Regions:
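Short, non-transmembrane alpha-helical segments in secretory-pathway proteins
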Residues: 55-88
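Short extracytoplasmic
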Residues: 42-61
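A short, surface-exposed beta-strand/turn
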Residues: 111-131
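Exposed beta-strand-loop-beta-strand "reactive/processing" segments of non-cytosolic proteins
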Residues: 88-118
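C-terminal partner/receptor-binding element of secreted or periplasmic proteins
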Residues: 43, 67, 130-171
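Ser/Thr/Pro/Gly-rich low-complexity linker/stalk segments immediately outside membranes or between
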Residues: 22-47
Length: 171
């Protein structure tokens, strides 16, 4: 068999196998690759890796869970939607200037990511500055960052770009 015939057959066979096992499905304005019955957010995966490659997180601080800011965040969250929010535990806390981003876990509620602003009167939770629950089938990082950027446009873009989800429940 000639080489060009073998190469053509190999390409056609490969395309046939891909066509039989991989589909593209649209959902809420996004296209997902579907293989083995599971949706994969290829665009989100690329966006997440692009974000990790190009972001500069030198202005963002990682705060410890026993910092004074962490105590204020937990106190504010406990009062936000009692009684279930009273058992919040801080998974991750980041700060840029007077803005904070917290990832929280709860015993009874879905995990959440909140954006808060510190001021002279104390910590405040801006209106709609919360993501809660799973992002499936979307890639969690880009989906949560995009949501928070739309809901709290005054929050620093660098703070949002430097957030990477930790809690498995967000995936």
């Amino acid at each position: 068999m000639k080489r060009h015939v073998a190469a053509t057959l190999l390409v056609l066979t490969t395309l046939g196998v891909i066509n039989a096992h991989v589909d593209i499905e649209a959902q809420d304005g996004r296209y997902f690759g579907v293989w083995q019955g599971k949706k994969h957010d290829v665009i989100g995966w690329l966006a997440d890796h692009n974000n990790q490659l190009w972001r500069d997180c030198s202005a963002v601080q990682q705060l410890s869970n026993d910092s004074p800011a962490a105590e204020q965040v937990l106190s504010l969250i406990a009062d936000h939607s009692p009684p279930d929010s009273r058992n919040a535990s801080l998974v991750k806390l980041q700060q840029q200037g007077d803005w904070l981003l917290a990832e929280l876990a709860f015993a009874q509620l879905n995990p959440a990511v909140v954006v808060l602003q510190a001021g002279p009167a104390g910590m405040r939770l801006p209106e709609r500055a919360v993501w809660s629950g799973s992002t499936a089938p979307w890639q969690p990082g880009p989906r949560i960052r995009q949501h928070l950027a739309q809901q709290v446009p005054e929050a620093p873009a660098t703070l949002l770009a430097c957030y990477d989800p930790v809690t498995p429940g967000l995936r």
